[in-house]
Amino acid sequence: MSEVKASLKGARLSAQKARLVVDQIRGKSVSEALNILTFSPKKAAVIVKKVLESAIANAEHNEGADVDDLRVSTAYVDEAMTLKRIMPRAKGRADRILKRGCHITVKVAD
């Protein structure tokens, strides 16, 4: 079986914060990765877990893979478009607020 991919585009989460979670599961078995994500207190863990579960479902449904043999072969986070917003400040000034997004990609293989 080749690699099976699942990705989430435009997640409303900074790439820096998502990478902290993704780095923990790269190269691990699928069951171990799900365990790590389940007990992680970070917001990114919930999002990455959904992407990983999607990759597992894709492998099982499309390739007929055995879930017990799957490993997280590749996992990476790319920056998405940043939304620029304005926060009014004193004396007519304004500060810029950057609402960052990211693209999360997880590939599983046996």
UniProtKB/Swiss-Prot annotation:
The keyword NAD does not apply. GO terms for molecular function: rRNA binding; structural constituent of ribosome. InterPro entries: Ribosomal_uL22 (IPR001063), Ribosomal_uL22_bac/chlpt-type (IPR005727), Ribosomal_uL22_bac/org-type (IPR047867), Ribosomal_uL22_CS (IPR018260), Ribosomal_uL22_sf (IPR036394). Keywords: Ribonucleoprotein, Ribosomal protein, RNA-binding, rRNA-binding. The keyword Ribonucleoprotein applies. GO terms for cellular component: cytosolic large ribosomal subunit. GO terms for biological process: translation. Pfam families: Ribosomal_L22. Transmembrane segments: none annotated. This protein binds specifically to 23S rRNA; its binding is stimulated by other ribosomal proteins, e.g. L4, L17, and L20. It is important during the early stages of 50S assembly. It makes multiple contacts with different domains of the 23S rRNA in the assembled 50S subunit and ribosome. The globular domain of the protein is located near the polypeptide exit tunnel on the outside of the subunit, while an extended beta-hairpin is found that lines the wall of the exit tunnel in the center of the 70S ribosome. Belongs to the universal ribosomal protein uL22 family. Part of the 50S ribosomal subunit. This is Large ribosomal subunit protein uL22. The lineage of its organism: Bacteria, Pseudomonadati, Pseudomonadota, Gammaproteobacteria, Oceanospirillales. The gene is rplV.
